[in-house]
Regions:
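Acidic/polar-rich alpha-helix caps and helix-coil junctions
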Residues: 1-2, 6-29, 40, 46, ...
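Residue-level signal for threonine
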Residues: 51-53, 223
């Protein structure tokens, strides 16, 4: 189901939004505007939020999360007739996200008062599986990961990883799917020393990056104002 309101028992921490909050009344400079495909905002007028095509193709058809995005034929099993009609009217392209629904399920509205998820219990299962594997029990970590996915996402999933690093990579794959659009991938890329390869992933030519792991472009620079106002920071700290 679409994560449009804070009514799921899996939410542990969130930003609770009210219709009268300035982030809503000031216009469309808010999370639903940038992420929502079926409400009015930046995303629905062309700044579509789309999944990496290669990652999408790695999601099994038996995984319910595959419906969080439109497929190559602009279809999702997770959408009802009203949602399909709105996606068609807006012209949502293939691989557009359907994970985040509009506020109260009302199509095309500009009252973007959806609550914003910050932490869900699903992430805790993934953290546990990785911790078990990297703590010396890869078989336990693999079992934890498989049970979570089997119970809640894909009954056909089998974790074949046997080494600690292989289980860690399997967890990372699940994190990329489960936590898509929740602001965690950048930190995983740094933490796990991964690169960003967008070749063949459906991105516009100007954004087809192939950044190797550990590249300096992955590190945010210290703002110039901080460098100027803090005598303990020098230009060399940014190089």
């Amino acid at each position: 189901r679409q994560m449009c309101i804070r009514d799921s028992h899996s939410w542990m921490w969130a930003i609770v939004i009210a219709e009268t909050d300035r982030v809503v009344t000031s216009g469309i400079v808010n999370f639903p505007s940038h992420m929502g495909s079926l409400n009015y905002g930046y995303a629905s007028v062309g700044s579509w939020r789309m999944i990496n095509k290669k990652l999408y193709n790695e999601i099994p058809d038996t995984d319910v999360r595959k419906g969080w995005w439109l497929d190559a034929n602009k279809h999702s099993d997770n959408l009802n007739a009203t949602q399909v009609a709105q996606a068609t009217k807006y012209g949502c392209p293939a691989y557009t996200q359907m994970k985040y629904g509009p506020y109260k399920g009302v199509m095309a509205q500009s009252t973007n008062a959806s609550d914003i998820p910050l932490m869900r219990v699903e992430e805790m299962y993934l953290i546990l599986a990785e911790a078990q594997a990297m703590g010396g029990n890869p078989s336990t970590g693999a079992a934890t990961l498989q049970k979570f996915v089997n119970d809640y996402r894909d009954p056909a999933y089998v974790c074949t990883a046997s080494s600690a690093t292989a289980v860690q990579d399997a967890v990372w794959q699940q994190r990329r799917i489960e936590l898509w659009g929740e602001g965690l991938s950048y930190f995983d890329i740094l933490r796990l020393n991964k690169g960003i390869d967008r070749r063949g992933a459906g991105f516009p030519a100007a954004y087809v990056f192939n950044v190797p792991a550990g590249d300096n472009t992955l590190i945010y620079r210290i703002p110039e104002s901080e460098e100027q106002g803090n005598s303990l920071i020098s230009a060399s700290d940014n190089n």
